Amino acid sequence: MLTLGGERTSGESVRKQNVLAACSFANFVKTSLGPVGLDKMLVDDVGDVTITNDGATILKLLDVEHPAAKILVQLAQLQDEEVGDGTTSVVILAAALLKNADELISRFVHPTTVINGYRLACREACKYIQEHMAYDVNKLGKAGLINVARTAMSSKLINLDADMFSQMAVDALMAVEVSGGPKGPVYPIKAVNILKAHGRSMSESMLIDGYALNCTAASQQMPRIIKKAKIAFLDFSLQKVKMKLGVQVVVKDPAQLEAIRQREADITKERIQKILNAGANVILTTGGIDDLCMKYFVEVNAMAVRRCKKVDLKNMAKATGGQLIVSLADMEGDEVFDPTKLGNAEEVSQERICDDELIILRGPKVHPSASIILRGANDFYVDEMERSLHDALLVVKRVLESKRIVPGAGACETAVSIYLENYALTLSSREQLAIAEFARAMLSIPKQLAVNAGVDSTELVARLRSCHNSSQSKPDQAHNKWWGLDLNNQYVADCKEIGVFEPLVSKIKSLKFATEAAITILRIDDLIKLKEEKQPDHDGDECGY
């Protein structure tokens, strides 16, 4: 016990606790790995239900207390943000590395030796993947990109219509391509807006050219199409100005009340006029628009849209070269509207898409935009569809920007495992043991893929190892490096033929993130947990009554 009133755990005990927590976490998500993985139903404290098999979403919704387990949660979230795919794999790999390291340390191998061996193994694994497993996606053309997207959504709900959604993800990102970047074209994910609409089947989801807003014009009398639109993005309400609460006005003549009301209306009209005089013919605001303001817009044939989402206005402002304005007041307190803050687009129109009226912005000045309308039976369905499609968009973005892909279906992990086993034998130091355990941990991914498919994992992984061993030892069989698990036919197959590809950056980052997380936890030899401070009781007054 510490003098601070906390608890201290050190040595082997804390290491065992951390490894157990990590393995327990991995056991929870491992059944959701792969194209035939299962979903999880999570119910929060207020009864909201989430059904998903996305590793990052599952771990984010869990109430985690153990500090080592929190590291794995952050690991999955980092992988989700950086790549979009591989969140479950990275947690399973980190847990396997920890479990194998714990076995080594139990056999009196020093943790520092294990850590050095893991770092060396990770470096060699990344080098091998980049030099021997990577493939230029341009050689496969658009079909290669579609296969990458299909692989990313193979374990998701939208796999039922994978052909349509993979094509949609690729078309959406290619539609928002922005050339002229320092490293070539860039593909901003935020330029693709995803809208959800209940009803119909998911096969009726569609891709729209332009940025779609789930809003309508404030009045039926406003035009439905504005050509050569100049757009004002406002983060405040356009309503009649009223004096704030607490302001008292003393009048001697009741007729002066009408003058006050008239001045309030004039202030509102002046604000509207400043916006219109700047050239704006489309006004989008996050707040409300009252009838008085609406009247002024209708008179000049302008379109006004209220209650827009702030994030949508930010994205649209970026695409059109405009700026989101939070107030008309300048630094000196005067109300002005700068015309340079207007966005420009070829057309803004209100159209009926599916069962809803939407505002669609086409031909923005700075960079193009696209929107995807998702249809589904209920909230759970469309929410999971959105998560799945977002992951697929991120994966395709990474491939488009890096141009490099690797075979999926456990091919990379098995090839690296065989390579590291042989590499470990070339070392005469104790790190050889750690590298061999790292190689064994790599097989946790193909084994789990086979287990989730309900097939004999031992036989299938042994056959896959045989293929990759021959590819590395026999030059005439080098093409075997493309072989992975074909879980639909319960056999091994050429990933090029079955179209299973993943981004190179996904594999590299998964390896690095999992290794660093395992090393971070292995370096811990002391856990000091302080007790919560009791809050003073303030039920009574200062005298204690």
Swiss-Prot record:
PROSITE patterns: TCP1_1, TCP1_2, TCP1_3
Keywords: ATP-binding, Chaperone, Cytoplasm, Nucleotide-binding
Gene Ontology molecular functions: ATP binding; ATP hydrolysis activity; ATP-dependent protein folding chaperone; unfolded protein binding
Main location: cytoplasm
Gene3D superfamilies named among the record's database cross-references: GroEL, GroEL-like equatorial domain, TCP-1-like chaperonin intermediate domain
A cellular-component GO term for this protein: cytoplasm
Domain of life: Eukaryota
Localization per Swiss-Prot or TrEMBL: Cytoplasm
Protein task: Molecular chaperone; assists the folding of proteins upon ATP hydrolysis. Known to play a role, in vitro, in the folding of actin and tubulin.
Family recorded in the similarity comment: Belongs to the TCP-1 chaperonin family.
Assembly and binders: Heterooligomeric complex of about 850 to 900 kDa that forms two stacked rings, 12 to 16 nm in diameter.
The protein's name: T-complex protein 1 subunit alpha
Organism field: Schistosoma mansoni (Blood fluke)
Highest classification ranks of the organism: Eukaryota, Metazoa, Spiralia, Lophotrochozoa, Platyhelminthes
Gene: TCP-1A
